[in-house]
C-alpha cells in the first residue's frame, strides 16, 4: 500500500523540531483506557519528556505512567539514527487503509532485498527501508512459539533505557510452521509498552495455542542480525522485517487436529467471524 513520500515525512519531522513542546503535551490529560486523537502522522512531533499519541490509537490503550510520562516518541538516545529508529518503532498511525496481507516468504524476500541493497545498520534517514515497505500497515497469520518481555535488565533506546517489564516491549516469536521448533526460522512482532492494554501480556499470548492474526506497522530492525548457516544470534530470527508496533491481536476460531492444516485454514479464511480479538477471547474464558 502507498506510504507518505519521503520529502513529506522529512518536512513534517523538520517542522516538528521548531514546534513548542507544549503542543505535543496537549493531550496529556487523556483519561486512561480512552483512545487518543491528534495529528494523523505518527512521525510528525518530537517529544522528549512524555509520550502523547499524535493520532487515534489503533487499540483501546491505557496510559502507562512509568513510561509514557518519561519517554517520548524519539526515545532516549541522542544519536539521530536511533531517534529515527525509535520514531518508526513508535508509529501507531499506519492504519490509514486496509492492511496488506503479508506471508512468511514476503518477509524472507524483504530480508534478501535489504541484504542485496546493503542497507546499513545505522539509518539517520530511513528512506531506503521506507521504499521497501517500512511504514505499511500489514496483517500476518502465524503461531506464537513464545512471548516474553525483552530488555528488562537495562531497557533499550526506544523506551529511554528504563529497566523492567512495564517499560519494555513484549517480544513475540512467530512460526509459519507450527511443527518447526527452530526459532532461526521464526519472524517477529513487538508489542510496545506505550499505552499497552493490560490484557496484552506474555502469559495470555503464550496460553493461546491457536493461530493468531497480528496487524501493525511494518518495521526493519537493523540493530539485530538474522540467523545464517551456523550463526544463531539472539534473538533468533529469519528476517529483520517485523511487525512493530503491534496494533491488534486476533485469535482464529477454526478447529483442526492437524496444526499445519489448522494454520492454513486460518490463513485462507475469508469469514470475519473466524477471527476474535484477544480481549474478547480472554473475556469469554473468564465467563
Language-model features and meaning:
Residues 25-37:
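Bacterial Sec-dependent signal peptides at the C-terminal "C-region" and cleavage site
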Residues 1-9:
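N-terminal secretory signal peptides that target proteins for export/translocation
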Residues 36-287:
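OB-fold and OB-like single-stranded nucleic-acid-recognition modules
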Residues 16-27:
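Bacterial N-terminal signal peptides
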Residues 11-14:
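Short, hydrophobic alpha-helical membrane anchors of single-pass surface/secreted proteins
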